[in-house]
């Protein structure tokens, strides 16, 4: 099963260390079938590593924290553990979820598998790299849209009661919805947000169904610095899509899945999973990307 490894780069591309042993492994039942898609940010001297844990039935967002990237304390599942019936009940109370949510998340009507309750899959948990107005903020994804949790002073606030109210007002927490052809099936988080003078740069993934199956592309959007629920701009085309042989064919075909970035001067390097088999990198001018986004602001939409 999947584990989280460690490597070290000198500069953006020169690999100088790759550990032979996993950095984070499964210890609990909720992650017994793998730990996937890690993202990492540093907030006030603490590293926050979010990942998707799979127990053979459910895939849910989890958190581990560290001060030194050697010793990690697992905080467990931080997304709601909610069944389809509960999701339906809460969101229907105020008509706050579109019909696509129910098509993607009903698990063919099953409520239990292998003796475990089936929960709504909630993945792609990604923290903003600093507190906003003194509070934590993170993205997560229940198909087909990217949602956002804003204004949590402490992660201990993420209780069942908190999430019950969250789902009662679900529409208020939608960050990005599928909009263009390349993301017409669903969208999901990619890299930790990058702070720029124009707003938070969000590199995410968009998915389109095709005759050859789903195609995963990297996408870009810009949201407000003080209120990240406000979308400023979005590229109407993929930032990059599967083109190379090793992106088109692999464990999962047709996948470019961005999860990390680094900025050197004006160059943004984006690290991504290629066909679920390889780690690859692309680069783009950061200022050029922001300028292109500003040509595609919401007010300029046709």
Identify what each model region corresponds to.
Residues 1-33, 42-125, 130-185, 195-251, ...:
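Beta-rich carbohydrate-recognition and catalytic domains
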Residues 38, 125-129, 190-191, 258-263:
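Beta-rich, blade/repeat-based domains predominating
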Residues 246-248, 256-260:
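Short glycine-rich, acidic/polar surface loops and turns
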């Amino acid at each position: 099963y999947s584990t989280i490894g460690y490597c070290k780069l000198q500069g953006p591309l020169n690999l100088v260390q790759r550990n032979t042993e996993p950095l984070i492994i499964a210890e609990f039942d909720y992650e017994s079938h793998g730990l996937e898609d890690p993202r990492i940010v540093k907030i006030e001297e603490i590293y926050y590593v979010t990942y998707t844990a799979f127990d053979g039935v459910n895939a849910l967002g989890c958190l581990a924290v560290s001060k030194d990237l050697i010793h990690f304390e697992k905080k467990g599942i931080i997304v709601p553990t909610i069944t389809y019936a509960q999701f339906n009940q809460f969101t229907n109370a105020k008509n706050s979820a579109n019909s696509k949510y129910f098509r993607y998340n009903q698990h063919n009507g099953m409520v239990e598998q292998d003796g475990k309750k089936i929960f709504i899959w909630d993945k792609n948990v990604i923290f903003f790299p600093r507190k906003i107005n003194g509070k934590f903020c993170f993205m997560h994804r229940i198909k087909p849209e990217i949602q956002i949790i804003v204004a949590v002073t402490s992660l201990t606030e993420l209780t069942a009661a908190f999430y019950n109210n969250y789902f009662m007002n679900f529409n208020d927490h939608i960050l990005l919805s599928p909009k263009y052809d390349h993301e017409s099936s669903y969208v999901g988080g990619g890299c930790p947000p990058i702070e720029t003078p124009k707003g938070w740069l969000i590199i995410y993934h968009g998915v389109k169904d095709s005759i050859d199956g789903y195609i995963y592309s990297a996408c870009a959007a810009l949201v407000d610095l003080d209120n990240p629920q406000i979308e400023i701009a979005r590229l109407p085309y993929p930032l990059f899509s599967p083109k190379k042989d090793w992106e088109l064919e692999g464990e999962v075909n047709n996948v470019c899945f961005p999860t990390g970035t680094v900025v050197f001067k004006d160059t943004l390097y984006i690290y991504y999973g290629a066909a679920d088999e390889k780690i690859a990198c692309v680069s783009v001018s950061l200022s050029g990307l922001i300028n292109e986004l500003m040509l595609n602001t919401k007010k300029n939409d046709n």
